[in-house]
Amino acid sequence: MDERVATALGEAFPDRSVDRTFGVGPSWNGANETVGVAFADGGRGFCKVAVDGDGTRIARELAVLRYLDAERSIAGPTVLAGDPNASVPYLVTAPAPGGELLGVWEEAGETRREALLRRVGATLATLHAEPFESHGEIVGSDAAGGLDTERAPWPDVLRATIERTREIGTSERLAAHYDAVFDCVEANRERLEGAPAALLHGDVTKPNLFAVDDAGAGSDAHESAAGPDGIVPIDWELAHVGDPARDLVRAEDQLLNGFDSRGPDRYADALYQGYRDRAGGLPPGFAERRPVYEVVRMLGRSGFIDQWTTFLDEPLESLVERADAELRTRLDAV
């Protein structure tokens, strides 16, 4: 067992024996390590530790999960233990109900995939439904059990999230892309400042969503465990209070798109239709601000270009050229 994980589990569960830990799949985030935990009493959980000793991300995720548990607008995994101020900051959660969307997706036909995406869209609309007074970075829980935020104008919060992307990125090969994206945000500050404020997940991907079987939908037990749409988001460490349009653009990109290509229109339409059906429309100003967020999304390629090389099994220089070309195209569209 990793020494940091052992330290965290020993502090979190001093009277509970661990049978073993196990891997949970690859991650492109080098700032944290997450392992599955099998306890000797038969229980299971997932332990996330901050490998650099910085408890900021743990504090953020812990606060959001406690907030969701109190609000119950949508469900998140149950917190078993957590301490962002420990020598090894940690968060331990219970397994989320249902199956990881990545696996469910691979086994589903087109009709069910569209239905799943409508449910994801509805879940995001539910998350975004509660307005916040201002944008900001989440730093913990407040005295009333809500979210403690460092308030700032939305363009500044957006810049801060871009900085976080750079911190967890795995390659500086395309470092100039960050400067280009920062310049784009600054040039469009006035366009961005009018955005509404809502809680954003910040990293909607198939591995970060769990889907409960449709058969349970509509029951009280189903809604308690998995929210009204049977979709449970996990991994909230990148959550922030920002423009719902940004969350939706990122969700479409990470759920459906390739390195420099878009997924099938019918899938994107299903995601947005689910959102519209729940919210009555897309976030205000979505079309106006979307091109800026498309530029920001390029950093999910640029900052992890080495990971994409392995994932796509293509030469690095080839992907660098494609990324440069795609960024220019997106900047021209703003």
Tell me what each language-model feature is.
Residues R246-G280, E294-F311:
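Active-site activation/catalytic loop segments of kinase-like enzymes and analogous catalytic loops
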Residues M1-R16, A129-G202, V212-D214, D220-D229, ...:
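An alpha-helical support segment within catalytic cores of ATP-dependent transferases
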Residues P95-A108, I162-R164, M298-E314:
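A glycine-centered beta->alpha junction motif in the catalytic cores
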Residues G300-V334:
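ATP/Mg2+ or Mg2+-diphosphate-binding catalytic cores
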Residues I234-A239:
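Activation of the activation-loop gatekeeper triad in protein kinase-fold domains
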Residues G25-P153, G169-A175, G194:
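ATP-binding pocket architecture of kinase catalytic cores
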Residues D15-V24:
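Conserved N-terminal boundary motif of the eukaryotic protein kinase catalytic domain
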